[in-house]
Amino acid sequence: MAKAPMRVAVTGAAGQIGYSLLFRIANGDLLGKDQPVILQLLEIDNEKAQNALKGVIMEIDDCAFPLLAGVSAHSDPMTAFKDVDIALLVGARPRGPGMERKDLLEANAQIFTVQGKALDAVASRNVKVLVVGNPANTNAYIAMKSAPNLPAKNFTAMLRLDHNRALSQIAAKTGKPVTAIEKLTVWGNHSPTMYPDYRFATIDGKSVKEAINDEVWNKDVFLPTVGKRGAAIIEARGVSSAASAANAAIDHVRDWVLGTNGKWVTMGIPSDGSYGIPKDTMFGFPVTTENGEYKIVQGLEIDAFSQERINLTLKELSEEREGVKHLLA
């Protein structure tokens, strides 16, 4: 028997990431090749954005995707999020010229408070929320705190792009395919303070750390390359990474819904206190997923260097959280 369609909301739907994302969702890349989807697309309430969204929907229609059971355009989160099973919160206020990080946090806090409240009011009680729009961890924290009637575990932030970037750097360094690499993780914030960690990773079952055996490369090349990759892409292309971000969002949600078969992935999730990360902090952890639930990989040894890096990214997240506290009161 055919499956009932799942409702997927995407915000910032006419933006660059949205444009790279929507066609792949409609094609079945997000939820599987036998799962029909209904797209509920949100854009800001101005004529230019809504017209752009109409154009995107015309293109989606013109693809005649067999799995697409419906698509609608919205300017109000209360209609866009009605009964949704998955919400991809892509739209966020970008940092403008002369804007301090504090201003950026405040501008986004307003957006994600409204969206969190709307999800709380009208989304499915099992909705899975992924925040892509930056600063992703803190935006996800704000949305979660604005939705007290939904389980906190339903809210996640995207660190999969950092995870995939780290994978590709290790594959290039070792000359092995990305599929051979397992047990990699990225700790912390989706920002240059993140900590990509291959101490436990394996290639074809053998230790990556031993295969690379180069601590100087780890500290001076690998960590900064992954941490500053977004900036390097802006420098080269003139615009921020969109297709790779959309791809990471699809990886994140697909693995969350369909399971990882015991493989580790990285998700930004509300901490349960593991590894000394304060409860509710939206933090990148190694996880495995099964039956639509994620579980933090436990029992990993945190050496002195790793602890230092984790403390650094945690400090930044705590400062961001402090910076928006008054807006959540």
Curated annotation (Swiss-Prot):
The lineage of its organism: Bacteria, Pseudomonadati, Pseudomonadota, Betaproteobacteria, Burkholderiales. SUPFAM superfamilies: LDH C-terminal domain-like, NAD(P)-binding Rossmann-fold domains. One of its GO terms (molecular function) is L-malate dehydrogenase (NAD+) activity. CDD domains: MDH_chloroplast-like. Its EC number is 1.1.1.37. NAD(+) binds at residues 12-18, 108, 115, 132-134. InterPro entries: L-lactate/malate_DH (IPR001557), Lactate/malate_DH_C (IPR022383), Lactate/malate_DH_N (IPR001236), Lactate_DH/Glyco_Ohase_4_C (IPR015955), Malate_DH_type2 (IPR010945), NAD(P)-bd_dom_sf (IPR036291). Keywords: NAD, Oxidoreductase, Tricarboxylic acid cycle. It comes from Herminiimonas arsenicoxydans. It comes from the Bacteria. It holds the Pfam family Ldh_1_N. It catalyses: (S)-malate + NAD(+) = oxaloacetate + NADH + H(+). The active site is at 190 (proton acceptor). It is an enzyme of class 1 (oxidoreductase). This is Malate dehydrogenase. Substrate binds at residues 95, 101, 134, 165. Belongs to the LDH/MDH superfamily. MDH type 2 family. Catalyzes the reversible oxidation of malate to oxaloacetate. One of its GO terms (biological process) is tricarboxylic acid cycle.
